[in-house]
Amino acid sequence: MSYAIICSSKTGNTKKLAQRAREVLGEKNECSTADADLVLLGSWTDKGGLDPALEDALPQLAAKRVFLFGTCGFGGSQAYYDRVLDRFQSALPEGAQVVGRFMCQGQMPPAVRARYVTMAEQDPKRFEPMIENFDRALGHPDAADLTAFEVALRAAL
């Protein structure tokens, strides 16, 4: 099966998932979006949705089978991941057929934690949970995330 990957990865987390997809699907089968049987659309989460930089690529997905994937700094809840993926999906053009979806937590840059620590001095009740989430996100996507991604991708084939 031929496939194309359209991916935006600000910190490298979503890029790790894209690389796993290449390993699963075989690099020799990757082709242009126009020629692909399946298009994998991946994004880091920007304010709860797709990276706006991907907007120009979306119209070409109108008649394509699409597998959505991404990473986000906040995690721990499939319900949250589903809401983010719903926003990703709502950005697709009419006629795009979503055949699978996957989202996992991704680690954030150290500057984010430093900002949370500073803000926690003023509002610890609000920012301590954010620091705890940051610490839980370290190392993600991890091996378990990559395995879960592979399972979701294979199920969509």
What are the roles of these predicted feature ranges?
Residues 3, 20-28, 46-157:
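FMN-binding flavodoxin-like domain, especially the glycine-rich phosphate-binding loop
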Residues 43:
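Conserved strand-to-loop "acid loop" that flanks and positions the catalytic carboxylate
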Residues 37-40, 65:
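Structural motif
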Residues 26-37:
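Short acidic low-complexity segments
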Residues 12-16:
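Short N-terminal binding/cap micro-motifs at the start of the first secondary-structure element
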Residues 2-9:
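Terminal, regulation- and interaction-focused segments at domain boundaries
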Residues 7, 32-33, 59:
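Generic structural signal for beta-strand residues in well-ordered domains
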